Amino acid sequence: MEVNRLAYLTAMGSLRPPSPNGDWSKPQDAPHKSVIDMMASGVSHIKVLKVDIDAQHLCVCLPHNMLTCCHPAVDMENLLGSGSFGKVYASGPGICAKVFTSAEAFYHETVMMDLVALARSYNCDDFKSVCLQFYLSACVTCKTIWYPRFSQSLHTFKDFTVDHLHDLDREFKGLTDAVFFLNQKCGLFHGDICPSNILVETFKGPGSGIKSLILTDLGTAAIHAGNTFKSLSINNPQDDSVIYNAQIYLSPFLVCKDYVKPLCVLRRCYLLRHHAQDVDVEEITDTVVGQNMALKIDCSTLLQVLLLVLARVMEQPNSLTYESWLREIEDDSSDAYFLLLLGPKLVLLTHLSQLWEINFDVGVNTQGVLSRGQLPHPHTRLLKECCQLFREEFDAVVKEEVLIKLGQGVLKNIIFELLQFDYFEIHGRQPQHGLFAQSHAARADSEHGNWRTS
């Protein structure tokens, strides 16, 4: 029994494709030719030193221009921001410099950004990368990468109004294209899409609209399993010694910020914690994520960011009720923690269902009832109570003018598109999971047992 439980936890913690004979079935990774594959037969920004077909591994070296300090000066007196791996300073006109405290973090982000640059060069006619950040240069000696400069991100941009809805509709379609480009043409899984990692460019003038949203920060991006070559290292061309292995350890707990974790990842985390007993499930990690799973998680996380931003638009100024609920939940060591994160997301989706007179099926409803299977009774009651409490607070701060605008269908298509990926099951939405509940089913917030199968 103990062996079976450990096998279950290990399988639940892994995001890689299952073995052909395994029980964890899901759609196979789609064949494509990504930038990782193309690097094996050409020389570009990063030069290929050695190809190990059996190990599915590439050895590369950095180009000469990254090894010399021929770049704009960094204004160390003008700090723009800071993060886990370094700080961002002003540099030349219109650019900024990200100075890393860790050589490993610098190498990783440099390689990921150069792969994106390579993909762009190989796909000149593909404009899906317009909303994906590009880098200007990098210096190994200074452990610094130069980027175009933006004044704010979705995390710091708080002055949303109903007039921004059309901008959000347009730009999140562009961000969705960027995720597809990253997945299909770059062979990468972002894994950390959040408001802080989406930059904002506004039109000039007070109360101006959003000109563009840009997906950035590949500091924890990973090479997904859809590539022919699934790992990569930076080697010294003189003696072939390994300088850095571009490898990220993945688990459902490490993927995405908790407050924007999609439903499929919340489900995995919940099950891992629920069945853990004395096993440290956070130590169960893997180094490969399947291509389809990578796309599902990134698109589903993008949906959660959109819902969070939409909640800012819907709420009275300075309320941030939706965001506060998600950020202030305590005791992340329990399985119930992941159900409490689920509550506000379900309530907001229910609001949209009612506005558009459509019954979304996301695998669970605000009554704590699953489309397939069931939660333990105490957890059903907990999720139901969480949804009720949040709805009471949220309804009190929602602006009527926004509901009217949303009722006209703004954001409807992009939310439908992103909902195609997420579902409260470990592999996300699959072909048998319809986007909408059956026409005769009860509303998502009604008192009903199983609104999808009853």
Curated annotation (Swiss-Prot):
EC main class here is transferase
- Which keywords appear in this protein's UniProt record, sorted alphabetically? ATP-binding, Kinase, Nucleotide-binding, Transferase, Tyrosine-protein kinase
Which residues hold ATP?
Answer: 80-88, 98
The UniProt catalytic activity note for this protein reads: L-tyrosyl-[protein] + ATP = O-phospho-L-tyrosyl-[protein] + ADP + H(+)
Q: What is its EC number?
A: 2.7.10.2
Q: Give disulfide pairs as residue numbers.
A: none
Sample GO molecular function, one term: non-membrane spanning protein tyrosine kinase activity
Where does the source fall among the domains of life? Viruses
Q: Where is the active site?
A: 192
Regarding protein family, the annotation reads:
Belongs to the protein kinase superfamily. Tyr protein kinase family.
Q: What is this protein called?
A: Putative tyrosine kinase 36
Its lineage reads: Viruses, Duplodnaviria, Heunggongvirae, Peploviricota, Herviviricetes
Q: Which gene encodes it?
A: 36
